[in-house]
């Protein structure tokens, strides 16, 4: 039974997240329905990162097993045909060994968060940014962000309904910078870790926003982290600004 690795792009706006639900539209549900229409099989997808409602992806990775040995370009093109007009695209399909698991083989996941930092709201990108109309200092945000990098208990930045067994995570990257001049109204937060807690990225971004408008100092952010107290962190940044941008796998496996 061949295993296929899919690279997927989607606009999360119309979906109630990645994970299949009985009555609500989801990315997984849309792709699995396309698989059934194309192949006649009820295959199940496993993805690298299960995104929440409204969260986007430009390089999500998933795998599925099919009984028939299809050409990979046929898999890609047939799924794209059956997914239309939904905002989901299969960028590539390839066969992989049975040992490959899109979720468990991942060694690093990358997310990007976009903040539109200007007085006027977004006209074209409103479903892909968090509009913050007051001035933010990206350098202050970046300085505060470095207090969160490393292996820590991230209970303060964890959703109440998070089902992870442990709040301990190793944050490998959390960089904040204003975009180049052509997009200078945007502040971009880039982060990477092997895994994240539910709502961790959005909670961190909301807290860094307070550092950017000088309501919190970098030391305050470190204290919030150490306290484990969710009530002390900033607002939960909206889902719209968050995009899953990639996943790394051990090249030797």
From Swiss-Prot:
List of residues binding substrate: 111
Enzyme class (EC, first level): isomerase
EC number(s) recorded for this UniProt protein: 5.4.99.12
Record-level Gene Ontology MF annotations: RNA binding; tRNA pseudouridine(38-40) synthase activity
Catalytic activity: uridine(38/39/40) in tRNA = pseudouridine(38/39/40) in tRNA
One GO BP: tRNA pseudouridine synthesis
Keywords: Isomerase, tRNA processing
Active site: 52
InterPro entries named in the record: PsdUridine_synth_cat_dom_sf, PsdUridine_synth_TruA, PsdUridine_synth_TruA_a/b_dom, PsdUridine_synth_TruA_C, TruA/RsuA/RluB/E/F_N
Pfam families (alphabetical): PseudoU_synth_1
Keyword RNA-binding carried by entry: no
Function description: Formation of pseudouridine at positions 38, 39 and 40 in the anticodon stem and loop of transfer RNAs.
Similarity comment text for this entry: Belongs to the tRNA pseudouridine synthase TruA family.
Oligomer status and interactors: Homodimer.
Alphabetized NCBIfam families for the sequence: hisT_truA
Protein name from the UniProt record: tRNA pseudouridine synthase A
Species whose genome carries this gene: Methylobacterium radiotolerans (strain ATCC 27329 / DSM 1819 / JCM 2831 / NBRC 15690 / NCIMB 10815 / 0-1)
Gene designation per UniProt: truA
């Amino acid at each position: 039974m061949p295993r296929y690795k899919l690279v997927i792009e989607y606009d999360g706006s119309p979906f109630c997240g990645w994970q299949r639900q009985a009555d609500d539209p989801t990315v997984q549900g849309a792709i699995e329905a396309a698989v059934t229409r194309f192949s006649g099989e009820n295959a199940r997808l496993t993805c690298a990162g299960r995104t929440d409602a409204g969260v986007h992806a430009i390089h999500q990775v998933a795998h599925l097993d099919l009984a028939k040995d299809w050409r990979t370009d046929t898999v890609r093109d047939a799924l794209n045909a059956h997914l239309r007009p939904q905002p989901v695209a299969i960028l590539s399909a390839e066969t992989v060994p049975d040992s490959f698991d899109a979720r468990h083989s991942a060694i690093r996941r990358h997310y990007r968060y976009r903040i539109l930092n200007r007085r006027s709201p977004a006209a074209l990108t409103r479903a892909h940014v968090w509009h913050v109309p007051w001035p933010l200092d990206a350098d202050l945000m970046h300085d505060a962000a470095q207090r969160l990098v490393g292996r820590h208990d991230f209970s303060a930045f964890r959703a109440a309904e998070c089902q992870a067994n442990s709040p301990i995570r190793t944050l490998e990257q959390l960089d904040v910078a204003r975009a180049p001049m052509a997009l200078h109204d945007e502040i971009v937060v880039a982060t990477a870790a092997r895994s994240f807690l539910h709502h961790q990225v959005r909670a961190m971004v909301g807290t860094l926003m307070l550092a950017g408008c000088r309501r919190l100092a970098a030391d305050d952010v470190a204290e919030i982290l150490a306290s484990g107290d969710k009530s002390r962190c900033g607002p939960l940044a909206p889902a719209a600004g968050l995009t899953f941008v990639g996943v790394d796998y051990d090249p030797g496996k």
